[in-house]
Each structure stands twice: as structure tokens, then as C-alpha cells.
Regions:
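Surface-exposed patches in mature extracellular/periplasmic domains of secreted proteins
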Residues: 34-45, 123-127, 154, 240-244
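Internal "kinase-insert"/substrate-recognition segments embedded within catalytic cores
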Residues: 32-37, 49-138
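Middle-to-C-terminal accessory/interaction subdomains
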Residues: 104, 108-149, 163-250
Length: 250
């Protein structure tokens, strides 16, 4: 059975993910054509008791994918208890029993690919959708919600149509860290005392972002960077921001 078009979801106090910020970020991802979970607010009543306003957050399932006109595909995450700093991470799979029973060869291959991303010679352009990841990181720069850009937060959806991994945003936690004028591309600069201050708590996650910014041979990954800069320019335009906000001006 489904409620609000979802099979699984959780209730959270709005303060858990900084009130309306999380709501706006999820809808911003949908606004630019990225996969997103449902996240909205309700007045929650339990046994005739008014508990006030709660956030409803969708869990990861095929409904997320199919609602956005994509073919159902496996969604991966990292195991927080085994490490959160790339490359010292391990991956896990949502709906694991289903996928391993129905598509054992595919899942084995995908785990191999994801484990190989931790290796220096990994060809990220061959396995990750550069257009969608460029959009995603540009949105993180626009909003400063860098917690959602970390590998421990973002979920990896394998699109069987394109045979590429796409991001599904999660755990943005706006307000964590002070970044000033920092953007993700600044990780390409030589590290200094000032730059380490600018990247705040994501400094330790530099290697994750360099997987997209650089090729396996250390050269610039122009396929990604070109798209990323184009989206930075587009999303930072006042008209883009105003058009988005008008949709949610209630």
C-alpha cells in the first residue's frame, strides 16, 4: 500500500534538517531535471494528539525513479559505520535482496565499478553521467549545502537506459560550515592555509571531488568542468533564482 504515492517514508521534526531549506533543495533538484525524493510538511496527529508540523521524507525505492520518467534501477549508498571519507568507504544497496536475486550479474558488476572508483586509474566519465553530476555540484555551490555533495550523503542511482550513475540528493543540512566564496572547483587550486579555511568541514573530502575535476592521469576533466561552469553561470543568474522561487512563493 502507498500513502502520498510512497511505499516508505519517515517523519521528522523540521529542525532536524534545518526547516524549509531541505524542502527547497529537493525541489531545486527537480527544477533542473535531477532525480529527487519527496519532502514536504504536514500537521501530524497521533491518537487525537496534535503533534504540530512534521517533515515527511521519502525513503529510497523504485517509486522515486519511475515518478521521474526513468527506468527502475538499483540505488547505492555508503555504509557510514565503515567510513565516510573517500576513498575509505564501502557501498551498500537499497532493496538488496530483490536486486541480487533478480539481477545477480548486474549487481556484481556495479559493485565492482563502485569499488574501482576508489582507485586512482578510474575513468569516471565512462560510468558517471557528467551532465547530471555537473548540475548537482553546481546546485551545491549555489546553495552552499555542501553536506549533500559528500559521498556519504548523495545516493547513486544506476540508470539502466544510459548505463551511467546519477545523483539523488540527500541530507543537505544547510548551515553546516561557513564557506564564504568557496566553490567546488577551488579544490583544483594549490592548498594553502586560507583555502583550507574556505572549504570548512569538506576539506577532508577533497579526493571525492577530484574524481570529477581531474582525469585519472591528473589532467583536468574538461568534459565535466565545461558543463559544471555552464551550469554555475546559468544557476547563479538572477532570473533563474527568481523563476524557481516564484514556484514556491506561498
Amino acid at each position: 500500500k502507498r500513502l502520498w504515492g510512497m511505499e516508505e517514508f519517515s517523519f521528522q521534526k523540521p529542525i532536524t534538517k534545518n526547516y524549509t531549506y531541505e524542502y527547497l533543495f529537493h525541489n531545486l533538484l527537480g527544477h533542473v531535471g535531477l532525480a529527487k525524493v519527496k519532502y514536504f510538511f504536514i500537521n501530524l496527529h497521533l491518537n487525537d494528539q496534535d503533534l504540530g508540523v512534521y517533515a515527511v521524507e521519502e525513503s529510497f525505492s523504485k517509486e522515486i525513479i519511475e515518478r521521474q520518467n526513468r527506468r527502475n534501477g538499483p540505488i547505492f549508498s555508503t555504509k557510514d559505520e565503515l567510513g565516510e571519507y573517500f576513498p575509505n568507504i564501502a557501498f551498500e544497496l537499497y532493496s538488496e535482496s530483490y536486486w541480487k536475486n533478480q539481477y545477480p550479474k548486474l549487481i556484481s558488476d556495479l559493485f565492482s565499478i563502485l569499488n574501482n572508483i576508489k582507485m586512482a586509474k578510474f575513468h569516471v566519465n565512462d560510468y558517471f553521467d557528467m551532465d547530471k553530476w555537473a548540475k548537482y555540484f553546481a546546485i551545491m555551490d549555489l546553495t552552499g549545502a555542501y553536506h549533500g555533495a559528500l559521498i556519504k550523503s548523495v545516493k547513486l542511482y544506476y540508470n539502466p537506459t544510459t548505463a551511467l550513475f546519477e545523483p539523488i540528493g540527500y541530507d543537505f543540512h544547510k548551515g553546516a560550515g561557513i564557506f564564504g566564496g568557496f566553490i567546488i572547483m577551488d579544490f583544483l587550486q594549490e592548498e594553502t592555509k586560507d583555502s583550507k579555511t574556505a572549504c570548512s568541514f569538506i576539506c577532508g573530502h577533497k579526493e571525492w571531488f577530484l574524481r570529477f575535476l581531474e582525469k585519472e592521469n591528473g589532467e583536468l576533466n574538461n568534459k565535466f568542468i565545461k558543463k559544471y561552469i555552464e551550469y554555475l553561470i546559468e544557476y547563479s543568474d538572477e532570473d533563474f533564482v527568481n523563476n524557481f522561487l516564484k514556484k514556491y512563493d506561498k
